[in-house]
Amino acid sequence: MQKKEIIILCGPTASGKSYLGHALAKACDGEIINIDSMQVYKEIPIITASPPESYKSEIPYHLYNFLPITEDFSVVKYLKLAAEKINQVTASGKLPILIGGTGLYINSLVFGYNNIPDISEDLRQQVRKLHNEIGNTELHNRLTKLDPLASSKINQSDTQRLIRAYEVVLQTGKSIFSFQTLPKEQILSEFNFKIIFLNPERKFLYKICDERLANIFKDGAIDEIALIKKQFNPDYLNLKAVGIKEILAYLENKLTLSEALNLAQTRTRRYAKRQITWFKHQIKEKITLDYSNEEDFLQVTRKLSILIDLPNSNK
């Protein structure tokens, strides 16, 4: 039996995935499913550069900006939701087009994942209360006694990973890293994945990264993060999107606005570089689209339906 098709449009931040994916979905009767770990959160659409409402009014978008930032989210939870949406889209006769740059999600979807048990809400609250009382250093010391492997791999300044490892060892009695040795579970084995990798020339990409982040800062990101800071304790939130840390520092008068923007731009460029390296080495079978300027990118947009052998409505 011929496998059903899924398109994954991936690449570094600011590479044009949203624009290109939207054009592709319109041309090929597709629906878009998020595969970015930060764009799931509903309180931070601006800083995460989530698709605009104008896009969402034209075609269906799934798994964007739906989850409260107070809710814990994992790759396993993502995969279950993504599989559900993919099956719904294909059942309706549409083409699922997954867009994003989170390597862990893409790798787990395509090649399988390590199923780490969910943490009970009671235990989660207990660990967060404990961390609030004793801090990172002491929690890291306690993790060393329970799980020396995890403590050796996790820096005590990495609050999220530290708490996660401590929760897992308390819940399961096993190191979080022990689950990586188990056979991987496949969630969508009946599908064929066609992976498209956007690979802009480095200098051009860095220019776009800088410009986009400057616009994001101007277009409401500061107010967005200020509201979160007012309502929640950022230490316990999964706020890893580039720019959030710098805006928080600005709001706490630790950086000027210019310093915050410059630092965030530097981090964005480094993040983009890491993403490119990851995709080049981890995803072997893919269609790579190279471009070095805006005209090249527009040409890629026009030709994409033909390149991946899908019907084109000539839009």
Curated annotation (Swiss-Prot):
The record marks 102, 124 as: Interaction with substrate tRNA. Keywords: ATP-binding, Magnesium, Nucleotide-binding, Transferase, tRNA processing. GO terms for molecular function: ATP binding; tRNA dimethylallyltransferase activity. Gene3D superfamilies: 1.10.20.140, P-loop containing nucleotide triphosphate hydrolases. Its EC number is 2.5.1.75. Belongs to the IPP transferase family. Catalyzes the transfer of a dimethylallyl group onto the adenine at position 37 in tRNAs that read codons beginning with uridine, leading to the formation of N6-(dimethylallyl)adenosine (i(6)A). This is tRNA dimethylallyltransferase. It comes from Rickettsia bellii (strain OSU 85-389). The gene is miaA.
